[in-house]
């Protein structure tokens, strides 16, 4: 049995800004050259399975019982926005490029929970469960993911991997799909090895520039 959370929704002001930008632009356009920066809000596409990292107020009916994380094919779902945050206080100054090898937190914008994994089996593939955990962006050390990429910084046009700091698994999708109440959404889980199932690319979003606030300093995708 899946469960629906009744917690307070986080980030309504930010969501409104994102939706306004989307309406004004008529949708997403091809990503321009640049780097992913700390504080940016974006969607992440699994490049092999063509689904975006997603979460919502629905809990797993097994395993940890925490908020579920899935992959969706739709590009315009507001529940697919994640904020890039530092692994520690002051560890990711706003607007600075994210370094390859840097540990970050990915915070789900609408619920304020962090991308998380732990030693529970995932519901469909029996890999490692990936969930969303915490309140208002505050969780624990199992929310940390290392950005694995080539070169010095995370480039918006490049494919990257996210390796969990605590358990070493890679954020992955292998194609399993759920039934009701989230029919058609793909399972997201952790896998022990780097492969084609765990490459991701930055897509739609707002990318913070050094010294800029969210309302004025963005590059729209």
Curated annotation (Swiss-Prot):
Induction: By tunicamycin and a calcium ionophore, A23187.
Keywords on record: Endoplasmic reticulum, Phosphoprotein, Repeat, Signal
Example GO biological process: regulation of apoptotic process
Motif Prevents secretion from ER, residue numbers: 218-221
Entry GO MF terms: ATPase binding; misfolded protein binding; protein-folding chaperone binding
Domain MIR: 33-87, 95-150, 151-205
Expressed in which tissues: Ubiquitously expressed with high expression in the testis, ovary, uterus, and low expression in heart and skeletal muscle.
Signal peptide residues on this chain, from the entry's feature table: 1-28
Modified sites of kind Phosphoserine: 215
Subcellular location, principal: endoplasmic reticulum
Domain of life where this protein originates: Eukaryota
GO cellular component term of the entry, any: protein folding chaperone complex
Subcellular locations according to the entry: Endoplasmic reticulum lumen
Protein name from the UniProt record: Stromal cell-derived factor 2-like protein 1
Annotated source species: Mus musculus
């Amino acid at each position: 049995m899946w469960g629906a959370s009744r917690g307070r929704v986080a980030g309504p002001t930010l969501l409104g800004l994102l939706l306004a930008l989307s309406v004004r632009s008529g949708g997403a356009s091809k990503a321009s050259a640049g780097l992913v920066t700390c504080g940016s809000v974006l969607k992440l596409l699994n490049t092999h399975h063509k689904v975006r990292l997603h979460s919502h107020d629905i809990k797993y009916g097994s395993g940890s019982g925490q908020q579920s994380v899935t992959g969706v094919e739709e590009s315009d779902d507001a529940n697919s926005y994640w904020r890039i945050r530092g692994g520690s206080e002051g560890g990711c100054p706003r607007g600075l490029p994210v370094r390859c090898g840097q540990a970050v937190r990915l915070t789900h914008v609408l619920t304020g929970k962090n991308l998380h994994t732990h030693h529970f089996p995932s519901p469909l593939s029996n890999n490692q469960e990936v969930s969303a955990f915490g309140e208002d962006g505050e969780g624990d050390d199992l929310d940390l993911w290392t950005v694995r990429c080539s070169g010095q910084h995370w480039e918006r046009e490049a494919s990257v991997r996210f390796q969990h700091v605590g358990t070493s698994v890679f954020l992955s999708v292998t194609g399993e799909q759920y039934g009701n109440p989230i029919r058609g959404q793909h399972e997201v889980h952790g896998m022990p090895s780097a492969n084609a199932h765990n490459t991701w690319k930055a897509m739609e979003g707002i990318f913070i520039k050094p010294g800029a606030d969210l309302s004025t300093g963005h590059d729209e995708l």
